[in-house]
């Protein structure tokens, strides 16, 4: 969070912590706020008539007028807490210099702030305005490791596509480590496969890489939006030992028989939580991540 401190605990009303739950979803109010902010700032701003600046920031007062947030009666304090408490540092909040020339971080007026999602957009933004470039000309910017987390269900589709596809997002998302190593952004905690990418080779061959404010490593891929499998330094399982599937740009093994294949929640393009499982050789349905 760019403006520093959150405001601490809230009191009162039916809007307290864990209070109102919508649509039978069982989600806490805080989770509903975070998801609504992500959905708007990453994907729906244009449809909602909200103009993002070149760095991806939107006026907070207009954001809070967005239907799902308005229905939750979200306050500046709620947003400050959502920004400060996000385990993956999904958002940045800063004073709006046009309406808040003193750059106060204690104002309770939404008009005095700008907010953005740090990455994950399908809305087209200029990467150079929102992200830090990773280049061979500045070796200190190049991470020692670049990892992409995926799932057994999607591995056949990754092979078929010839690599990782950015899909409907602007970038393929990667991390500099795994969740068990304390890296909280760039890889889902339930990822089943770790794909290590040779970032140096890919940079040498023309791929562009970036780092977001919350430490996610991003690339647009090649002209087709793909990070080629020839850049896969190694692919292996996380919790399940499935051996090494790919090494130094070459396929060395298939997924073993008998493993459980599941489509993770939120990743099934055709709805549902994923199914029963078998080997799932036809799985993935085009997902690249």
Residue ranges and their predicted role:
Residues 1-289:
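Eukaryotic, polar/proline-rich low-complexity intrinsically disordered regions
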């Amino acid at each position: 969070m760019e403006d520093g401190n959150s405001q601490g605990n809230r009191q009162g009303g039916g809007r307290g912590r864990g209070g109102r739950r919508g649509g039978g979803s069982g989600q806490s109010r805080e989770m509903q706020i975070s998801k609504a902010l992500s959905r708007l700032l990453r994907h729906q701003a244009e449809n909602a008539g909200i103009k993002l600046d070149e760095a991806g920031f939107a006026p907070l007062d207009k954001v809070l007028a967005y239907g799902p947030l308005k229905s939750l009666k979200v306050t500046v304090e709620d947003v400050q807490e959502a920004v400060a408490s996000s385990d993956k540092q999904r958002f940045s909040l800063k004073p709006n210099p046009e309406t808040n020339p003193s750059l106060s971080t204690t104002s309770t007026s939404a008009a005095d702030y700008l907010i953005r999602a740090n990455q994950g957009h399908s809305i087209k933004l200029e990467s150079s305005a929102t992200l830090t470039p990773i280049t061979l000309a500045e070796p200190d910017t190049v991470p020692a490791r670049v990892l992409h987390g995926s799932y057994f269900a999607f591995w056949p589709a990754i092979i078929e596509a010839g690599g990782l596809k950015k899909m409907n997002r602007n970038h393929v998302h990667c991390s500099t480590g795994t969740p068990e190593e304390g890296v909280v952004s760039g890889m889902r905690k339930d990822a089943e496969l770790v794909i290590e990418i040779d970032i140096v080779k890919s940079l040498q061959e023309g791929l562009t890489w970036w780092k977001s404010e919350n430490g996610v490593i991003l690339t647009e891929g090649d002209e087709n939006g793909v990070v080629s499998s020839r850049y896969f330094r190694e692919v292996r399982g996380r919790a399940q030992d499935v051996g090494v599937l790919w090494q130094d740009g070459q396929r060395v093994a298939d997924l073993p028989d008998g493993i459980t294949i599941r489509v993770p929640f939120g990743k099934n393009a055709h709805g549902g939580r994923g199914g029963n499982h078998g080997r799932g050789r036809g799985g993935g349905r085009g997902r690249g991540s």
